[in-house]
Amino acid sequence: PNEIDRYSQRMDHLHSAIFERAEVKYLKVPDGYFAQMSKFLPHHYTLRGYWLQGELIGFVSYHFDHSIMKCQYFGLDRQVRDTLPIYQYLLIDAIAAGLERTGIRTIEYGRTASEMKSAVGAEPHSLYALVKHRNPIKNQLVDVFVQWLHPVQFERRHVFKS
């Protein structure tokens, strides 16, 4: 955790850079989130960093929940991302982390960058969520709004022989 504390601000910055440019913004994590999670869940939460010439240029966080490994948040240096395939390394390292941990049967990448994730063998699965507003009138509008939501279509790659 000492090294994580030392790079906490840099991780916050790298994650914010990705978050601010995202088309869909789900939840902005508070500053210090990654360091706090590593302390709060030491056996169920992992951070992996990516370094170039001694500088942290990216990271990914994993949360382990029984037999499922969830890739939660990541951060990348935008300039380095444009010159190196760091996002692909991040996806492949997630597979390695899942294989290294005993009992993991499923790796969940999330629903963004689906085409890139399919390049490493990821397959989309339906997600279900309960969406409810506290105000009953607004809750009826939520139903109408949710009907319009559909996953982004993408060209799925088949990296494994059928």
Language-model region placement:
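Short, charge-rich amphipathic segments
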Residues: E20-P30, A94, R156-S162
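A conserved beta-strand-loop-helix scaffold within acyl/acetyltransferase catalytic domains
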Residues: P1-D82
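Active-site/acyl-donor-binding loops of N-acyltransferases
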Residues: L52, R105-S162
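Acyl-donor binding region in acyl/amide transferases
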Residues: S67-K132
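Hydrophobic alpha-helix feature that most strongly marks membrane-spanning transmembrane helices
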Residues: S16, E20-E23, K39-P42, E55, ...
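Short, flexible segments with low predicted structural confidence
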Residues: D5-R6, Q88-Y89, F145
